[in-house]
Amino acid sequence: MGNTSDDDKILSYEDVVLRRSDLDILNGPIFLNDRVIEFYLSFLSTVHSSTTISLIPPSIAFWISNCPDTEYLKDFMKPLNLRDKDLLILPVNDNSNVEVAEGGLHWSLLVYYKEANTFVHHDSYMGVNRWSAKQLFKAVSPFVSNGDASYKECTDTPQQKNGYDCGVFLLATARVICEWFSSGGMKNRDELWFANVKETVPDLVNHLREEILALIKKLMSESVSK
C-alpha cells in the first residue's frame, strides 16, 4: 500500500473536495474548517432542495462581507438570485484579513427569513461575532430587500461549553432551521424557529460530529463502488 497524506483527497461532493485531514478534525476536539462547514451545508442543500432555500458557502459569505468594490459585488451577487429566496443561511467568521485563507477563531450563523424581512444572528459564544454578523448583514441586505430588512440577535441561542465547537453549533442550528422551514415553518411566522433551535440544538451537537463523519464515510464507500 502507498503512503497516505493528510492532503490526500478522499471525497468530492458537489463543489467540495474533502481531504484526509478533515476526518481528523471531525474525530477530535478541533475547530471545524471551511471545507467541513461547506460540505455539510452542501449536504443540507440536497436534503432541502427547495429553490427558495439558499445555503451560502463560507468562502462566498466571507467575500460578500469583505468585498471592497461595491460595483464588483453587484455583479458577483446577480447569479445568486437572493431576492428569490425565502430562507438564506450564511456562515459568519470573524476573520477580517482577506489575505489569510481559513483565518478566524469563531463561527456563527446569520439567517435571513423573507416572510419577516429579518436577519437573525445565532452566536453560540456570548455574541462575540456580533460585529462580523452586522458587517455581513449590511453587505447582503440590499440584495434581498429594499434595504429595509431588520437585524436581530437571538439571545436564546444555545451556548457552547468549550472553545472549539462553534462550527458544530453553526451546522446544528442551520439544520434545525432548514427542517423548521421545510416542515411548514412559514405558517408559524410569529414564533419563527427560535423554540426549535433552543430545544433541539443542545442534543444535536453532542453527536453531529460523529454523524457527519459517518456520512462522509458512507459517501466515500458509495463513490468507490460506482
Curated annotation (Swiss-Prot):
Class of this enzyme: hydrolase
Pfam families named in the record: Peptidase_C48
E.C. number(s) listed in UniProt: 3.4.22.-
InterPro entries: Nep1/2-like (IPR044613), Papain-like_cys_pep_sf (IPR038765), Peptidase_C48_C (IPR003653)
GO BP, sorted A to Z: proteolysis
Membrane-spanning parts: none
GO function terms (MF aspect): cysteine-type peptidase activity; deNEDDylase activity
Keyword field: Hydrolase, Protease, Thiol protease, Ubl conjugation pathway
Role this protein plays: Processes the pre-form of the ubiquitin-like protein NEDD8/RUB1. Has the capacity to discriminate between NEDD8/RUB1 and ubiquitin. Has no SUMO protease activity.
Family: Belongs to the peptidase C48 family.
The protein, known as: NEDD8-specific protease 1
Organism: Arabidopsis thaliana (Mouse-ear cress)
